[in-house]
Amino acid sequence: VTAVDYSTKMLEEVRRNLETEGLKAELHQMDVQSLEFADNSFDAVVSRNVFWNLEHADKAYEEAYRVLKKDGILILEDGNYYRRFFSDKYQKAYDEFQRGHEKEEQGCHARHNKENVDFSIMDEIAKKLPMSQVDRPDWDFNKLVETGFHKIQVEISGSPLPMSFCIVAQKG
């Protein structure tokens, strides 16, 4: 198992979690948009909540394809977390969700905000990110086809609009 993250703090967290669970993995600090691994290195690439915050998600898909062995699998979990800033229909769905859960502590941020993080900072960053401006997973599907992936399966969560999704794709 090999783990990659751009943030050294996240890698420290991974290291602690591995130690707690008695597991081992190689940890590397690098940019998924420019991986330092040789071609055809991995059987699988797994990504969770990474692509939404990339400047060049297309390059990250190309890199995943490059480092996967033939018939290797990409598993991606991601979402349209900040699409509401650029889409009226997403903003409307977000507002309706918020109204329906005013008295509950809902959402990932509310459930996991252990240090009183000011999420308005993340909102401002997300407004500048290109993936907040595209309809996903449609964009991802088209990019995967263009990159050479096949046997692409998409599972969407969220109603009435896709808020999060999981994609499994195979290298041709």
Model-derived segments and spans:
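Short N-terminal helix/helix-N-cap motif within the alpha/beta-hydrolase-1
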Residues: K9, L54-K59, R84
